[in-house]
Amino acid sequence: MLELTKRITHVDASEIHDNLVLPYELRIRGRLRATTETNLDVGLFLDRGPVLRDGDLLEAKSGEIIRIRAAEEPVVTARVETGLPLARLCYHLGNRHVSLQIGSGGAIGEDDRMGWVRFPPDHVLEELAERLGATVVHHTATFDPEPGAYNQAGQGHSHGHSHGHSHNHDHEHSHGHKHAH
């Protein structure tokens, strides 16, 4: 088994040994066993960090370079006018903490005034998108959602404020008595 242990950024295309095609649900994992396009058995042994994106490169302990490819998988694409309608759709879907891929236009001949939001099939989200004026289509496509504002390599999840870290302290609440923690 080829052990993939390192994320790398740039190599010459001729240095790429093979492709590893994975659906989104597997690209969020740092540890897994899989098979490449040429049936090479590989194991991912990556530190926690960003989701593997289509085109990302991994290096094996033995030096081989493997390119990540997003697999085609069942998705829903909701098409709506760009501008406020697209912003409204993104806001309401994002408010449900679902992974979203966002784009505009599309295939040759499609209206550039249309935007789209792609997400995993979910009847509640689909109904919401339709109520917000989107046309919903079930199909198979690659799913490469937005990484999110807090998803940066080597950093944990944060909400822009701190709660501190303490296990043993006393504090007083406005109701006049203390609690030991």
From Swiss-Prot:
It is found in: Cytoplasm. Keywords: Chaperone, Cytoplasm, Nickel, Nickel insertion. The keyword Isomerase does not apply. SUPFAM superfamilies: Urease metallochaperone UreE, C-terminal domain, Urease metallochaperone UreE, N-terminal domain. InterPro entries: UreE (IPR012406), UreE_C_dom (IPR007864), UreE_N (IPR004029), UreE_N_sf (IPR036118). Residues 143-181 are annotated as: Disordered. It comes from the Bacteria. One of its GO terms (cellular component) is cytoplasm. The keyword RNA-binding does not apply. This is Urease accessory protein UreE. It comes from Marinobacter nauticus (strain ATCC 700491 / DSM 11845 / VT8).
